[in-house]
Curated annotation (Swiss-Prot):
The record marks K333 as: Transition state stabilizer. Gene3D superfamilies: Ribulose bisphosphate carboxylase, large subunit, C-terminal domain, RuBisCO large subunit, N-terminal domain. GO terms for biological process: photorespiration; reductive pentose-phosphate cycle. This is Ribulose bisphosphate carboxylase large chain.
Length: 474
């Protein structure tokens, strides 16, 4: 009898069996319809890696700690997860990548919540494992097609706001907490009239005593209308609809719709995938863009031996739904290597991405024509970073300068103008064939000669750098 199969006909025998007898199947060839997962496994001393990998496959699918008589009431060989390959992690002791295949029928259609409940559930507390990290998931086309995905996507967003050929510019309003609704709206107006495309609620802003959500929405929409009238451009502000209950979240979204705002916002990890998918479907029905913030992600993804890599959270967001998501900047104050960051940025934006371990992509992923998500670069960036940001992210991104706009010595509007001039100069230089990375300083200095706003920003931030080594490196 093959130990890689569960044979009910062999008869029920109580007791505890090694997981590897049933769930380690190195001869298995994954099917096109399987959900594939790559786990970084660190077993406890004395636990063979084959047993550890099989335990992950078992505990995240059909297994439990002992043999149960109800195993004989179903065809476990059809439903079990299979650890089909194990590779050592280069440069690391006692760490392996275990590849596990899950049958499609284990997962509810259109539910990111259900996928994560299985794959990153109780197995992460398993005593036989010292640490466990989900590095990547391959979602088969058969499952991808059960999700709506982004409410609109990159192409439709550009058509809605009538802006092409460059990244979009944004700004998070600061201070993040404490402003009254009227002063908050004034800050939004100054940024938008100065040249930004979007402004943003900080993720912390919901409906606090100093600024209730309804008041904020009203003053912000007034700022949008005024700035559009002055500039002739379509403007927007990410109104954060995240709330304590789904009912309150939807009430805020409905009010934003009444105001005819073009875009709203949700904190998808703290708010939860069920709430996020609900909001994304509503946004498509109502023609409103959805900006996604990733507050809480570093708690989950920053440690390289335990947790969930952000590329998994990014893929799950594309399925759940969002038109923008924060991805880090590579050059700013937040964690992120270039190769790894661009790996998950491509997974957000492209229709088809090939396996590429040099960028942390463990599986080829086909999105079956699902719309792409705009990457948002935000966190500790200023005008001197503009050439690098354009070189790294290209056009389909939102470059979001909070302190890099509001910290301008002349105020918000000049800060916005400085960023817009720097961006337009970099786009022009790129289109002329200049090397953005090699000529970065020259490009910015040339533009600053005829823009006093940019010159002042360049002088203020000329010494500001964030040169720390990334914690989570490939």
């Amino acid at each position: 009898m093959s130990y890689t199969k569960t044979q009910a006909k062999a008869g029920y025998q109580a007791g505890v069996k090694d997981y590897r007898l049933t769930y380690y199947t190195p001869d298995y060839t994954p099917k096109d319809t399987d959900v594939l997962a790559a786990f970084r496994v660190t077993p406890q001393p004395g636990v063979p890696i084959e047993e550890a990998g099989a335990a992950v496959a078992a505990e995240s699918s059909t297994g439990t700690w002992t043999t149960v008589w109800t195993d004989g009431l179903t065809e476990l060989d059809r439903y079990k997860g299979r650890c089909y390959d194990i590779e050592p992690v280069p440069g690391e002791d006692n760490q392996w990548i275990c590849y596990i295949a899950y049958p499609l029928d284990l997962f509810e259609e259109g539910s990111v919540t259900n996928v994560l409940t299985s794959l990153v559930g109780n197995v992460f507390g398993f005593k036989a494992l010292r640490a466990l990290r989900l590095e990547d998931i391959r979602f088969p086309i058969a499952l991808v097609k059960t999700y709506q995905g982004p409410p609109h996507g990159i192409v439709v967003e550009r058509d809605k706001i009538n802006k092409y050929g460059r990244p979009l510019l944004g700004c998070t309003i600061k201070p993040k907490l404490g402003l009254s609704a009227k002063n908050y709206g004034r800050a939004v107006y100054e940024c938008l009239r100065g040249g930004l495309d979007f402004t943003k609620d900080d993720e912390n802003i919901n409906s606090q005593p100093f600024m209730r959500w309804r008041d904020r929405f009203l003053f912000v929409q007034d700022a949008i209308v005024k700035s559009q009238a002055e500039t002739g451009e379509i403007k927007g502000h990410y109104l954060n609809c995240t709330a304590g209950t789904c009912e309150e979240m939807m009430e805020r979204a409905e009010f934003a719709k009444e105001l005819k705002t073009p875009i709203i916002m949700h904190d998808y990890l703290t708010g939860g995938f069920t709430a996020n998918t609900t909001l994304a479907k509503w946004c498509r029905r109502n023609g409103i863009l959805l900006h996604i913030h990733r507050a809480m992600h570093a708690v989950i993804d920053r440690q390289k031996n335990h947790g969930i890599h952000f590329r998994v959270l990014a893929k799950c967001l594309r399925l759940s739904g969002g038109d923008h998501i924060h991805t880090g900047t590579v050059v700013g104050k937040l964690e992120g290597e270039r190769a790894s960051t661009m790996g998950f940025v491509d997974l957000l934006r492209e229709e088809h991405v090939e396996r590429d371990l040099s960028r942390g992509i463990y599986f080829t992923q086909d999105w079956a024509s699902m719309p792409g998500v705009m990457a948002v670069a935000s966190g500790g960036i200023h005008v001197w970073h503009m050439p690098a940001l354009l070189d790294i992210f290209g056009d389909d991104a939102v470059l979001q300068f909070g302190g890099g706009t509001l910290g301008h010595p002349w105020g918000n509007a000049p800060g916005a103008t400085a960023n817009r001039v720097a961006l337009e100069a970099c786009v022009k230089a790129r289109n002329e064939g200049r090397d953005l990375m090699r000529e970065a300083g020259d490009i910015i200095r040339e533009a600053a000669r005829w823009s006093p706003e940019l010159a002042a920003a360049c002088e203020l931030w000329k010494e500001i750098k964030f040169e720390y080594e990334a914690v989570d490196k490939l």
